[in-house]
Design a protein with these regions (language model features):
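Short glycine-enriched nucleophile-adjacent loop
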Residues: 1-7
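Helical cap/lid subdomain of alpha/beta-hydrolase-fold lipid enzymes
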Residues: 7-202
Length: 202
């Protein structure tokens, strides 16, 4: 929708690549939202910077997270619920298709024995919907489903594995499968090569 609402981007967006997306929302987000929708999240918001500093210090260097009082944790989680994402799709799917911009979906799939211990239950729960889930979303939830979209690849890895560097050992809680060995750089290079072969980039 950004390309639709900003004239300066008209004709400049040649392609969109989704990477372990949650376009269709997540059943996990549905469950989590039910837990927090009536809770006081002010305390959690105040400690958000400290938590993210542990989780991803390279993106939370001093001053990188500002205006924490404006963060809306409940709203953020709600935006990932299947209901919210389905409403977005109903409202915008025709607009997105009419932009005539190719969308390439890259998804992931894993098994319960390949995810962090504390994510095994969620992975198994998602298996009821899709045996090829990535521990957080199903294949259908990870893809745009419009005529201008194509599913290019299903990677072998869990949702965090293909997205994040290794988690610091101090916060792994003795869990395995948080070293995230998926070759992200090689995958990104392959995507750029594909886009070049399709004539979408030089």
């Amino acid at each position: 929708t950004l390309a639709q609402h900003h004239d300066k981007l008209d004709g400049k967006v040649q392609c969109v690549v989704t990477w372990a997306g949650a376009i269709g929302g997540s059943y996990m987000a549905d469950n989590f939202y039910e837990l927090i929708k009536n809770a006081d999240t002010d305390l959690l918001t105040g400690r958000l910077h400290d938590f993210l500093q542990l989780l991803a210090p390279q993106i939370t260097r001093k001053g990188s997270l500002r205006r924490l009082d404006e963060y809306d944790i409940k709203g953020a989680v709600h935006s990932l619920t299947t209901h919210a994402r389905n409403e977005f799709y109903k409202q915008y799917h025709q607009l997105l298709d009419d932009l005539n911009i190719p969308i390439i979906n890259i998804t992931a799939a894993t098994t319960a024995l390949e995810v962090p211990t504390f994510q095994m239950a969620d992975c198994l729960n998602l298996t009821r919907y899709d045996g090829n889930n990535d521990m957080q979303v199903t294949q259908e939830q990870a893809k745009f489903k419009i005529p201008m979209a194509a599913h290019a690849a299903m990677l072998h890895g869990h949702h965090w594995d293909i997205s994040y560097p290794p988690f610091p050992r101090a916060i792994r809680m003795t869990s395995p499968n948080l070293d995230h060995p998926f070759p992200r750089k090689a995958a990104i290079i392959a995507i750029y090569q594909l886009l070049a072969e399709l004539g979408l980039i030089n």
